[in-house]
Amino acid sequence: MKPLTKIWMDGKFVDWADANIHILTHGLHYGYSIFEGMRCFPTPAGPAVFRLQEHLERFLNSAKIYRMNLGFSAKELSEACLELVRKNGKKDCYLRPIAYTAYGEMGLNPLKNKIAVAIASWEWGPYLGQDAQTRGVRATVSSWVRIDPRAMPVQAKCSANYANSALAKMEALSAGYDEAIMLNSHGVVAEGPGENIFRVKDRILSTPPASSGILRGITRDTIIQFARDMKIKFYRNDSTKEELYTSDELFFSGTAVGIAKIREVDGRRIGYDGFPITDKLHKLYTAVVHGKVNRYSKWLTPVTA
């Protein structure tokens, strides 16, 4: 990772090299932290953060679920994000707000510990590589099952949840694949380790419902709105592993990955007739995040003061 200039910590901007925490930080030991991920893109009117308010709303909702009093409002966090981009001077960057139980009492009860809040930014290219945007990725159905919502609140973007994702990711990479696809405890498709998943069959677009134990992704919501506006037939429904194999098109979506085609699942080729619907959605998404479609300009928050 290439260091930038500043990181925001508990209301103050500190130098990148000084953004440190104690080794006995409670959240480091018990996974008691929440985070968000959002992107800033260059646009004709200057850099802008895509769907900033929706990301911060989810961040605050995650805090409520985990009984974290952040001590900062959505407005204060929004301004901190924008000022951080201005100070670091990068028009194309990734933003990572995080809140965690700070140094203090150890043990499983987090309620005695102060909640620390920080925001970092860095330059981050396509999460699954440039080929993911053009040629597509090779995926495998993981042996690791997606966390059950009865065990962990999956709508909260909690760091602890991502240990489950990391196991699936490592398994896929070790087997020579680019990414994993995770099933839930009922054996139906949930999502990728850090992405939602969409399927096209007979020109009908579908994605797993929230009841399958997925994170309600903001890029997922963006694509659903695009599909409605483009008159693409769309459903939220469960899919089996076998239905993945017989898909006409598959793609991942997420803030980090954008929209990435899946060209193969467990050795089965996907997209024999190309990816016409995926390509249309990707083209629109790219135009929207770069401020070239007025209809969706409300989703862009300008960085310029």
What is each of the regions a protein language model found here?
Residues 1-72, 76-83, 106-305:
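Helix-start/capping segments and mature chain N-termini
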Residues 86-93, 232:
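Short secondary-structure junctions
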Residues 100-105:
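Short, internal active-site loops enriched in acidic
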